[in-house]
Amino acid sequence: MAIDGILKQGFITTSADKFLNWAKTGSMWPMTFGLACCAVEMMHAGAARYDLDQFGIIFRPSPRQSDLMIVAGTLCNKMGPALRKVYDQMPEPRWVVSMGSCANGGGYYHYSYSVVRGCDRIVPVDVYVPGCPPTAEALVYGLLQMQNKIRLTNTIAR
């Protein structure tokens, strides 16, 4: 937490914006939107070896309970409206992590007629995690970058 000053009496002085962002980074609740093989690596990152719980990241089954969406895998044209619908059900503020080459830009199936060439054409993406499939370490690094981005966001003026 970026603390502006600590007084000798045991008080901490900081802005409300920094405090709220600190609280949000310590309690990110992602909703999994696993579409292909990248979802297996996402499950791997949530398992005991990498333990995302230590960062305050707890997977939620419902979009109404989550503030972060991880889009992992190949996004087809038929799945595009469902992705947007789930994104619209998430409460504000909400963030999106695009995981894998297929979610980032179509990947191996870029020239296929039925593939959306990047989920950023459907929903705004905050962090891109590259790889085919990206490793669990890459996803953890991307989530830590998401936490840094949230920390630097101006929450109250939003």
Curated annotation (Swiss-Prot):
Name where it mostly resides: membrane
Q: Tell me the GO BP annotations in alphabetical order.
A: aerobic respiration; electron transport coupled proton transport
Task: Kindly state which reaction or reactions the protein catalyses.
Answer: a quinone + NADH + 5 H(+)(in) = a quinol + NAD(+) + 4 H(+)(out)
Listed under subunit, the entry gives: NDH-1 is composed of 14 different subunits. Subunits NuoB, C, D, E, F, and G constitute the peripheral sector of the complex.
This protein's encoding gene: nuoB
Which NCBIfam families does the entry link to? Answer: nuoB_fam, PRK06411.1
Is NAD there in the keyword field?
A: yes
Q: Does the keyword Transmembrane helix apply?
A: no
Annotated PANTHER family? NADH DEHYDROGENASE (PTHR11995), NADH DEHYDROGENASE [UBIQUINONE] IRON-SULFUR PROTEIN 7, MITOCHONDRIAL (PTHR11995:SF14)
Record's superkingdom? Bacteria
Positions contributing to [4Fe-4S] cluster binding: 37-38, 102, 132
Q: What is its EC number?
A: 7.1.1.-
Pfam families, per database record: Oxidored_q6
Cofactor(s) this protein cannot do without: [4Fe-4S] cluster
Query: What is the protein's given name?
Result: NADH-quinone oxidoreductase subunit B
Q: Where in the cell is it found?
A: Cell inner membrane
Cite the entry's keywords alphabetically: 4Fe-4S, Cell inner membrane, Cell membrane, Iron, Iron-sulfur, Membrane, Metal-binding, NAD, Quinone, Translocase, Transport, Ubiquinone
How does the protein's chain sit in the membrane according to the entry?
Peripheral membrane protein
